[in-house]
């Protein structure tokens, strides 16, 4: 396992669409492990493979309920609406309000290659959408309704809504 460099805004890899994983092998599993370690070291909520320069459809997420590893994730259902603050490990210091579905269902493969589904609401739904957007070359700043100023960012941190980055 290794800590990977998190690519920052301006790096063209963040704007590229990731390719599906066709074979789950030791290389893919190592990337997932590196992604999780990198996410935790950076105090993140999620990380997409694009963010470490790997153009494969891989995502790791932990909203405080344990690590999720998703291979080839795809949103198959969404409902409702929520607006909330988002940041990104690839765009340090920027926080914006983004409209997302309140609830999503995502189909994906686990590390054994079994097809799974996960339903997420609130923060998990937001994180799933945010990371899957990354896989499609879309950043939260593309969808932000508005950006928070420094005082607002401090208030959001104080109330615990942004205690961890994306």
From Swiss-Prot:
The keyword Hydrolase applies. InterPro entries: Peptide_deformylase, Peptide_deformylase_sf. Keywords: Hydrolase, Iron, Metal-binding, Protein biosynthesis. CDD domains: Pep_deformylase. It catalyses: N-terminal N-formyl-L-methionyl-[peptide] + H2O = N-terminal L-methionyl-[peptide] + formate. It is an enzyme of class 3 (hydrolase). GO terms for molecular function: metal ion binding; peptide deformylase activity. Transmembrane segments: none annotated. The active site is at 131. Fe cation binds at residues 88, 130, 134. It holds the Pfam family Pep_deformylase. Its EC number is 3.5.1.88. GO terms for biological process: co-translational protein modification; translation. Binds 1 Fe(2+) ion. It comes from the Bacteria. Its cofactor is Fe(2+). Belongs to the polypeptide deformylase family. HAMAP family: Pep_deformylase. Removes the formyl group from the N-terminal Met of newly synthesized proteins. Requires at least a dipeptide for an efficient rate of reaction. N-terminal L-methionine is a prerequisite for activity but the enzyme has broad specificity at other positions. This is Peptide deformylase. It comes from Thermoanaerobacter sp. (strain X514).
